[in-house]
């Protein structure tokens, strides 16, 4: 079997992060600090996906594409302190202008 390159040379490859946390949940940097680090390291896009907080704030001055998003987790009450996470779901987009109904910094405790 002949080996072939996985990517076509004529296409532009983008460097990005689709799962990223800030101090709005358990991350170590503010949204602005996280975006700045990604810019410094040459990223083209980043999705801010804090736990149970939907991020769609306008960071229009950032020189990379910001994708709004959120991470939800399912939990089992009474299975440990204070609960056991059994799965995580990362969602990205759509933008607020498209009518998703979420408020910035609104916490979601169920889905």
Where do the protein language model's features map onto the residues?
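A metal-dependent hydrolase metal-coordination microenvironment
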Residues: 3-111
């Amino acid at each position: 079997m002949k080996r072939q390159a996985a990517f076509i040379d004529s296409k532009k490859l983008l460097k990005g992060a689709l799962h990223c946390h800030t101090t709005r949940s358990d991350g170590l940097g503010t949204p602005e600090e996280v975006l700045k680090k990604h810019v410094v390291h040459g990223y083209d896009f980043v999705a801010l996906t804090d736990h149970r907080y939907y991020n769609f704030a306008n960071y229009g001055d950032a020189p990379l594409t910001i994708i709004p998003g959120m991470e939800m987790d399912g939990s089992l009450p009474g299975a440990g302190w204070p609960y056991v996470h059994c799965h995580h779901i990362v969602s990205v987009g759509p933008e607020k202008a498209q009518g998703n109904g979420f408020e910035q910094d609104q916490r979601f405790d169920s889905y």
